[in-house]
Each structure stands twice: as structure tokens, then as C-alpha cells.
Swiss-Prot record:
It is a peripheral membrane protein. Changing residue 58 to E: Failure to complement the mitochondrial defects of UPS1-deficient cells. Changing residue 84 to E: Strongly impairs interaction with MDM35. Failure to complement the mitochondrial defects of UPS1-deficient cells. Belongs to the slowmo family. GO terms for biological process: cardiolipin metabolic process; phospholipid translocation; phospholipid transport; positive regulation of phosphatidylcholine biosynthetic process. The gene is UPS1. Changing residue 61 to E: Failure to complement the mitochondrial defects of UPS1-deficient cells. A 1,2-diacyl-sn-glycero-3-phosphate binds at residues 26, 58, 148, 152. Changing residue 62 to A: Decreases phosphatidic acid binding and impairs cardiolipin biosynthesis. This is Protein UPS1, mitochondrial. Present with 704 molecules/cell in log phase SD medium.
Length: 175
């Protein structure tokens, strides 16, 4: 069984601010678990889309019942692929863990789309959780992962809002 999760978040600002914040979101006070982020590749394709691949290293706290399977490892590598279409004010992102996939594989697909009617940017996310365990512990691992993901999404949105605010303050300094 694979566990699916969907969420929507509205950023009350323009697409340029949201996409700029996405690429500058680390570090922020809500993401101390992000240890490093490296850009692997970045280019503009023939259609004018900005394509970026980044590698992130994250740490995390695990429940005691999972620790024996990971032998004390509390860090993971994440691949992040993004495509920004400036002409349509859209950005599509895909992230997934590169290690521990036999225990849990988490894949996130997010589309950021500017809505001119509300002057806001809407982020629609779909997440797929799949565990390599047998039925007994499989649902427990997937449920824990989804719950943890929900907590992290809230922090991620607060982190993005923090970065958007800081970028706005830098753009319009108060005297």
C-alpha cells in the first residue's frame, strides 16, 4: 500500500517573490534540520524555463521503534528538481529522499501557480509515502511519516513566509 497526501497553501504575494524565496529559503529559523544545500545544475532550457537540481542534507528525530532499522543514522540526502516557467508564472518541484528508501520513500510534487484574481501564489502539493516493510509495520511507518511530514510542511510554510518577508524588507528598506 502507498499512502497519499495532498495539501494546498496560499501565499498572499506575487509569484516572483515566492519563487525567489523558494531558492533562498535556507537557512531560516524554522529549518534547523537542513544541514546543507548544494546546487548540482542550473540552466535555462529552449523554452525559457529555469531548470535546477539541488542536493540537500537533512537531519531528523526518529521514533525509537525505527532506530534499529537505521542503525543510528539520523541524516538523509534529498534530491530537489525544479522547473520555473516565468512566462506562465508557474514552478513545479519534485523532491525525494535518496537513501533509506527500503524503509521509507517520500516523494513530493508541488506546483506553484500565480492567481491574478487574488494576487496570490497557490502551492498545491501531492506527497507519496511508500514503505518497503511488510504489512505489520508498513502502515505504522507510513502513518508516522505522514504525521511528521504534516508538521514539517507547517514549518516549511512559515519558513517561506519568513524569507518572503526578509526579501521584501531588503527590497523596501524603512528609513
Amino acid at each position: 500500500m502507498v499512502l497519499l497526501h495532498k495539501s494546498t497553501h496560499i501565499f498572499p504575494t506575487d509569484f516572483a517573490s515566492v519563487s525567489r524565496a523558494f531558492f533562498n529559503r535556507y537557512p531560516n529559523p524554522y529549518s534547523p534540520h537542513v544541514l546543507s544545500i548544494d546546487t548540482i545544475s542550473r540552466n535555462v532550457d529552449q523554452e525559457g524555463n529555469l531548470r535546477t537540481t539541488r542536493l540537500l542534507k537533512k537531519s531528523g528525530k526518529l521514533p525509537t521503534w525505527v532506530k534499529p532499522f537505521l542503525r543510528g543514522i539520523t541524516e538523509t540526502w534529498i534530491i530537489e528538481v525544479s522547473v520555473v516557467n516565468p512566462a506562465n508564472s508557474t514552478m513545479k518541484t519534485y523532491t525525494r529522499n535518496l537513501d533509506h528508501t527500503g524503509i521509507m520513500k517520500v516523494e513530493e510534487y508541488t506546483t506553484y501557480q500565480f492567481d491574478s484574481a487574488t494576487s496570490s501564489t497557490i502551492a498545491d502539493s501531492r506527497v507519496k509515502f511508500s514503505s518497503g516493510f511488510n504489512m505489520g509495520i508498513k502502515s505504522k511507518v507510513e502513518d508516522w511519516s505522514r504525521t511528521k511530514f504534516d508538521e514539517n510542511v507547517k514549518k516549511s510554510r512559515m519558513g517561506m513566509a519568513f524569507v518572503i518577508q526578509k526579501l521584501e524588507e531588503a527590497r523596501n528598506p524603512q528609513f
